[in-house]
Amino acid sequence: MPKQDSLWLKSLRWIQKYLVHTIVVPQDPFADLNLDASRPLAYVMKTESLSDIAALSEITAKLGLPSPYEPLVVNGVVAPRVVCLEGRKPLFGDRASNEPFLECFMRLLAVHKEKPELDIQLVPVSLYWGRTPGKEDDTMKAAVLERENPTWLRKCLMILFLGRHNFVQFSNAVSLRYMADEHGTDMGIAHKLARVARVHFRRQRKVMTGPVLPNRQALFDSLLKSESLRKAIQEEAASKKISETQARETAIEYLDEIAANYSDSLVRIAERFLTWLWNKLYSGINIKGAEQIRQLHHDGHEIVYVPCHRSHMDYLLLSYILYYQGMVPPHIAAGINLNFWPAGPLFRRGGAFFIRRSFNGNKLYTAVFREYLDQLFAKGYSVEYFSEGGRSRTGRLLAPKTGMIAMTINSVLRGIERPVTLVPVYLGYDHVMEVATYHKELSGKKKQKESVWQVFGAIRKLGNFGQGYVNFGEPITLQNFLNETAPNWRSEVADDPEQKPTWLTPAVNVLANRVMTRINDAAAASSITLTSLVLLASEQNALERCLLERQLDLYLTLLKRVPYTSFTSVAEGDGKHLVQQGLELNKFSISADPLGEIVSIDDKQAISMTYYRNNIIHLFIIPSLIASCLINNKQISRAQIFGVVNDFYPLLKAELFMGIKDLPSYVDQVLDLFIEQGLVEETELLSVATERASQMLLLAGSVNETLQRYAIIFNLLAHRPKMERSDLESESHLLAQRLGALHGITAPEFYDKKLYNTLSVKLKELGYFSGKEDKSDVERIREQANNLLRASVRQTIVASVTAEQSFNG
């Protein structure tokens, strides 16, 4: 390797300074890969390349890592800092052998044998000039810009044309101490490490670039030759009494409507545009859990991203983040309503494939779509779809639509060899552009059809939107899920591939709910969501600034000390910092008088802020319920509190997609924290500390509207234990409207008919519609709900139910 200060290297670095823009994956190797700055470190690269090492040198200088030009000196032994598996490839002839790598590695192992306390970190580094996967028929371009083993001339062309899209990826370090202790220090282990490293770099390239892209027409021809689609075309021709040629033409039209037309050139242009857009809109995008997804890709999993759906921004945000995290943007299932000019063609070339809202019993369309989805899985393309089916208008997760999940499971049943893994993704924003529109729709205004004019209107409103949040939840590998749900699924499918298993529909429903639960498990508690939660629980949606900051400090402590799950993320900073962030985003108003500052939510914005509160209300609903038990009882035992929580939890779980694994332990941990923080005093019983009652009252306020809904339902059931589900839904909704009008409840979800349907389904599952005469469970829960309400609200509910009963009687 030439010396760092040689004229040749100086010239190369000067040229690359202007031609090359490098993106580092992960962005902070020290934090994300647990590198130890106190231990010696060497880099492993696949191929020796002066331009690659020059690019690496620029990055290591910025990150505070050792320069690749500095030799590694340990125990008197001098070794190169960069160890390459293969030598440089000349313009003609073969590249050098890997003997230098083996010799260098043997020297480092020998030093470990002599010095037991030594532990060198061996960090694999991959460099990519552009990320085009290539096409199946792209022979000319591959010849010019061949990326895996380019000659120096090809490398010059790559730097010239693709230098602005250079990626440097660091991988988890290998401990040479571990290798020496576990496997010895002979030449055999050196050869083994070389083989493992080659496999690693090959897999890493596949993760970064993805599989080759098919020619669209060749893909259509391949799909039309599949047995299932040929059969569907024949059935279409027979049922519609048309020729098979006509039915085939219809199938081609469906394919053309559905299929993506991925373009790497468009993705590169979009990356620049989106970088500008995110920098204009957001002060930062917070990401959690990307490393585990990279590892799944590296291990050969077929990845299906299942994010929640807040905004049309979701389509762009997740793809952008994955691209910058060193993964290929997925093929995205988009609603056919987005297939309008010019967005439709652009989305399609960005990887979107379009799906109709309803298949309406169209067997040919169903067969075409299923076959296309199977092909995406078979070829190794990652896929993304929104299981909610549409954007949430209230900020809560919607009940899942199971169609795409069912098709994914069916693809596994039809014999995909690789593990297929669903990755739940929580997407959150400090500002959702469509919130005002959502509330108009909830109040009865007809949804506007998507068009180019809406796009221009949205662009006109671009401003400071705060921060975005992308949290990857706990993955679900479908083969493991099927083994757990139906242990004999492989043999059942093998015996009768055409027969739909009896367990399939229940399994799909369980899986869909598990996905939604794991999305909520990965929620992001931000300054806006937390501050909204506090202020909306206060009287008049206003608090003294110092009290608001103190309450936020309590919530931050609760989330950090008693974490909801390990996948949840919590805002950095203290209560004071969070309030300031919200004020800078103009989400809250501030006024001052001689006694201090007051932070409030403007009446016009109160409904909008419920959207952000609802993003995280599930994180606080149990602590809030516990606080309500304590506030409404002078003294109460732990057992009594757990009894109340245990009675309400099945409904909360169904409504809010909660997944607390050990409820008794969680309740105890929350109570212990309350005691430690001086909020609660414990003798034989528990009671609220008088001087901290205001904080507990605020916390209890977050569950009030939920308890009011449950009080309506259980008061109705207590009066009419044999009432039908449909009657309970309609009458609960009617009474909720009355209660809201009398007590000023404005939260949109309070009047959401779908929510009462969700609750009635769960009540049926729990046996409340069995018609049995024993009403003890209903009476107990009714009594619990009533006792946790303000007297005026309780009186309204009881009186309204009695009046309704008299009217129906």
Curated annotation (Swiss-Prot):
GO CC annotations on file: plasma membrane
Residue stretches in coiled coil: none
Localization annotation: Cell inner membrane
Annotated EC: 2.3.1.15
Pathway of action: Phospholipid metabolism; CDP-diacylglycerol biosynthesis; CDP-diacylglycerol from sn-glycerol 3-phosphate: step 1/3
Bilayer disposition of the protein: Peripheral membrane protein
Catalyzed reaction equations: sn-glycerol 3-phosphate + an acyl-CoA = a 1-acyl-sn-glycero-3-phosphate + CoA
Biological process per Gene Ontology, one example term: fatty acid metabolic process
EC supergroup of this enzyme: transferase
Keywords associated with the record: Acyltransferase, Cell inner membrane, Cell membrane, Lipid biosynthesis, Lipid metabolism, Membrane, Phospholipid biosynthesis, Phospholipid metabolism, Transferase
SMART domains: PlsC
GO MF entry, a single one: glycerol-3-phosphate O-acyltransferase activity
HXXXXD motif (motif): residue ranges: 309-314
NCBIfam families reported in the protein's UniProt record: plsB, PRK04974.1
Stated family: Belongs to the GPAT/DAPAT family.
HAMAP family recorded: Glyc3P_acyltrans (MF_00393)
Protein name, UniProt field: Glycerol-3-phosphate acyltransferase
